[in-house]
Amino acid sequence: MTDETNKNGPEAAAPEEFDAAAQPETAEEPEADVSAAAPDPLELAKAENAELRDKYLRLAAEMDNLRRRTERDVKDAKSYSVAGFARDMLAVSDNLRRALDAIPADAREAGDAGLKALIEGVEMTERSMLAALERHGVKQLDPTGQKFDPNFHQAMFEVPNPEVPNNTVVQVVQAGYTIGERVLRPAMVGVAKGGPKAASSEGETPPA
C-alpha cells in the first residue's frame, strides 16, 4: 500500500503544479509619469504675470477716468455755482437798462448837471455789474444780424423785411447771456420774415 501511495503521489501533485503554471502572472503596472502631468512653472509665471498686468491696466484706466470726472465736476461746480446769483443780478441789470432807456434823448441833452450825473452813475453801475459777471464766466449775447438759433434765442415776433434772409435776428428785445458753455438766459429777439432763404448753418460759429 505504501508503494501504491508512492506511485500515485507525484501524479496527484501534478495537477496542482499545472494549475499554478496555468495562472498568468499579474503584470506590474507602470508608474505614472509625474513629470509629464505637472504644470510648467514658467508657463504658470507667464499666465500670472499676464493676469496681473491686465488688472493693473484696468485699475489704471479706472483711476484715470475717476480723475477726469473729478476734474470736470470741480470745474463745473466752480463755473456754474454762481448761476443762480448771476441770474438774479441780470434782473437788476435789466432794470438799470430800462431806467436808462426811459430817459428821452432830448432830456439827456438838455438836462441839468444833476440828471447827467445820475445817468452817468447808472451807466457806470451797469457796466461794473456786467464786468463782474463776466469775470465769473457770464457773457452777453449779441445776436443782431445772426441766424436765429433756438438754443440761444427766443423769438418774440417777426419783422417783415424782404431784404433780409428769413429767420435773421433784426432786433434784440432783451439781451441773452451764457455761463461757461451753458445758456444762462436766451436772448429775446425779433426775426425777419419774407426775405430770401437763410444760408446753411454749416460752418457757422456759435452766437457771440
Curated annotation (Swiss-Prot):
Record function comment: Participates actively in the response to hyperosmotic and heat shock by preventing the aggregation of stress-denatured proteins, in association with DnaK and GrpE. It is the nucleotide exchange factor for DnaK and may function as a thermosensor. Unfolded proteins bind initially to DnaJ; upon interaction with the DnaJ-bound protein, DnaK hydrolyzes its bound ATP, resulting in the formation of a stable complex. GrpE releases ADP from DnaK; ATP binding to DnaK triggers the release of the substrate protein, thus completing the reaction cycle.
Protein name: Protein GrpE
Entry GO terms, CC: cytoplasm
Pfam families: GrpE (PF01025)
Database matches in Gene3D superfamilies: 3.90.20.20, Head domain of nucleotide exchange factor GrpE
GO term, biological process aspect, one: protein folding
SUPFAM superfamilies attached to this UniProt entry: Coiled-coil domain of nucleotide exchange factor GrpE, Head domain of nucleotide exchange factor GrpE
